């Protein structure tokens, strides 16, 4: 996963953007104050695989364990040293796809372009929802695993702890908007599903297609917005 990168700190960028906006349109109403305890982080989640302990041993040998290579933003989660090859219909392949740990039910998360490359019609799903999803073949150095289901395009989502849920006045399963300001690509992404958990830090996950489309690496501002139903819907 790759985060927004800048030679300036997030607070510096937000301060400059607010100053410009205040001159042009008056003081904007931010979704969360800049001094919020838990800052908003937006990361790109590249294609990856989750594996059960059983599948780790099949693919990498008896007694094999996932070995952390790089720790991720969420505490306790990591990109492992191990990679696998994904094989789709008609023998289309994606080599060296990173495994993420720790172990959990086996699942493959792809971007839309990845699924096209593999020839797999992967539905957009919340992670863990494998109902009526396609499968694939995973190839490791010591063995092969055929997944009957579990290949998805991960729905863009935001991880929130209890204080974040309270601050944004949302609950797990709600959907939010993410506004990204970047030169030539300023965009608002809808349907960012909220995933609440007591142990997580505030973080939005987008896939590589979404991150590239909004030019996330050059973004100067990101903001989570709670959508409000049109007043006409109440009648």
Regions found by a protein language model. Give the residues of each.
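Short beta-strand-centered segments at strand-helix junctions
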Residues: 41-43, 48-89, 95-141, 146-179, ...
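Short, Lys/Arg- and Gly-enriched loop/turn segments at beta-strand edges
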Residues: 95, 184-192, 229-235
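Protein-protein interaction and targeting regions used for scaffolding, dimerization, and localization
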Residues: 1-38
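Serine/threonine-rich low-complexity intrinsically disordered regions
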Residues: 6-9, 35-38, 67, 104, ...
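Conserved active-site motif detector
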Residues: 224-226
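Short amphipathic alpha-helical segments, especially helix-boundary/capping motifs
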Residues: 29-33, 137-142, 187, 230
């Amino acid at each position: 996963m790759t985060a927004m990168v800048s030679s300036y700190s997030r607070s510096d960028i937000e301060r400059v953007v607010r100053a410009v906006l205040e001159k042009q349109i008056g003081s904007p109403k931010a979704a969360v104050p800049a001094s919020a305890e838990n800052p908003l982080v937006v990361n790109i989640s590249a294609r990856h695989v989750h594996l059960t302990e059983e599948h780790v041993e099949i693919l990498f040998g008896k007694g094999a364990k996932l070995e952390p290579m790089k720790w991720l933003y969420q505490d306790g989660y990591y990109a492992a040293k191990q990679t696998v090859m994904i094989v789709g219909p008609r023998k289309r392949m994606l080599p060296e796809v990173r495994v993420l740990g720790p172990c959990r039910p086996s699942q493959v998360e792809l971007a839309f372009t990845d699924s096209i490359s593999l020839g797999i019609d992967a539905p957009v799903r919340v992670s863990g929802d494998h109902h009526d999803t396609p499968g694939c073949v995973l190839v490791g150095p010591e063995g092969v695993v055929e997944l009957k289901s579990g290949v998805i395009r991960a729905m863009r989502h935001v991880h929130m702890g209890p204080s974040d849920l309270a601050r944004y006045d949302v609950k797990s399963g709600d959907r939010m908007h993410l506004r990204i300001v970047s030169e030539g690509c300023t965009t608002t992404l809808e349907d960012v599903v909220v995933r609440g958990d007591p142990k997580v830090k505030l973080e939005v996950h987008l896939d590589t297609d979404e991150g590239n489309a909004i030019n996330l690496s050059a973004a100067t501002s990101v903001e989570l917005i709670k959508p409000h139903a049109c007043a006409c819907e109440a009648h």
